[in-house]
Swiss-Prot record:
Belongs to the CheD family. It catalyses: L-glutaminyl-[protein] + H2O = L-glutamyl-[protein] + NH4(+). GO terms for molecular function: protein-glutamine glutaminase activity. This is Probable chemoreceptor glutamine deamidase CheD. It comes from Desulforamulus reducens (strain ATCC BAA-1160 / DSM 100696 / MI-1) (Desulfotomaculum reducens). Keywords: Chemotaxis, Hydrolase.
């Protein structure tokens, strides 16, 4: 994992994560049923942004991208934050995404993946003792998540809505 220098805006892809220190910003696009997880150490001013697609890696035989899943991606990102000096007991979380992007279809067909992603992320964070400070979950529209590490502020851009700071 490379640490960006200076005041960069670092893109986080789908099924990926990035960690960085202040004054960098992390941004991820395309949060539909996916969930964006921001973890932040406000004392050290380091944090990460994870863009998960699925809740549980145990349903798959060969996991080549652990950041794709909540159960493997969150611990992986915490390890990277620790390498930057972050302390797990100080971490707080902010969440966005988990939408139902295919409304109108048979619910059995779409498997409520956004809802399942959100639930799994919350369960994992709870087990790890990480407090969720804010969330922008559910609905039926895509989101962009922008994490300003200097301030800890997360801005959510939702299609058809004004910017929201959480």
């Amino acid at each position: 994992m490379e640490l960006a220098k200076g005041n960069a805006e670092i893109q986080v892809g789908i099924a990926d994560y990035k960690v960085a220190a202040s004054p960098n910003r992390l941004i991820t696009l395309g949060l539909g049923s996916c969930v964006g997880v921001v973890l932040y150490d406000p004392v050290k001013k380091v944090g990460g942004l994870l863009h998960i697609m699925l809740p549980d890696s145990t349903q798959f035989n060969n996991v080549t991208k652990p950041a794709k899943f909540a159960d493997t991606g969150i611990p992986l990102m915490i390890d990277e934050i620790k390498r930057l000096g972050g302390i797990p007991s100080r971490l707080t979380a902010k969440l966005a995404g988990g939408a139902q992007m295919f409304s109108g279809l048979d619910e059995k067909f779409v498997l409520n993946i956004g809802q399942r992603n959100s639930k799994m992320v919350k369960e994992i964070l709870s087990r790890m003792g990480i407090r969720i400070l804010a969330e922008e979950l559910g609905g039926n529209r895509g989101r962009t998540m922008i994490f300003d590490i200097a301030s800890g502020q997360v801005t959510i851009r939702t299609i058809g809505s004004p910017l929201k700071v959480i």
